[in-house]
């Protein structure tokens, strides 16, 4: 709960401050009586991928949440005029950012892990003018793999590719880790019990790891 209260919001402030602004008490986080009394918790969830449809099964039981990290990369170059700064004199941070997006896809595709994924779904260019070469370009990487070891390898490879791309453009890049959740195994006996109940009802039910971090 203490860590959750200090989580930063995109527009500034913390989760605790956002709760107070909504007339909620952040000290109540993690104090649910019923949650403390529960012997086990089972979440029913619509699949957010397409593993089951390809396997031909209507339901599956999750065995674990795959490891997951989010990193922020900041590329720093030189902001200049888009019309008068010729290519040899540019240090455009959007170039290594774009190359990092491509490198992220290539890295997971070549990793050998069929569950490895890397997504850059948010970018920010500053100062953000149409006729201005950006001086700073920031992107956020979401990466998930089957194992903790593979996650480290993939992130290291993407980071190295971004550094190489930044140097080639005469820019700098720095990375910050915003979150890291190791692989989380679910209780094996409970997983087996749920699978048994489902198989007695609907037939064969596979056990799969999941890439949805909230499970």
Regions found by a protein language model. Name each.
Residues 153-163:
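Short amphipathic alpha-helices in soluble, non-transmembrane regions
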Residues 176-215:
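An extended, acidic, His-containing surface patch that forms the Zn2+-binding/catalytic region
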Residues 1-149:
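Midchain, well-structured core segments that form catalytic/ion-binding scaffolds
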Residues 96, 157, 193:
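Charged catalytic carboxylate motif
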Residues 132, 150-154, 206-208:
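Extended hydrophobic-aromatic, low-complexity segments
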Residues 113-120, 170-172, 203-205:
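Short secondary-structure junction motifs
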Residues 103-110, 164, 200, 204:
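Conserved helix-loop functional segments at active or binding sites
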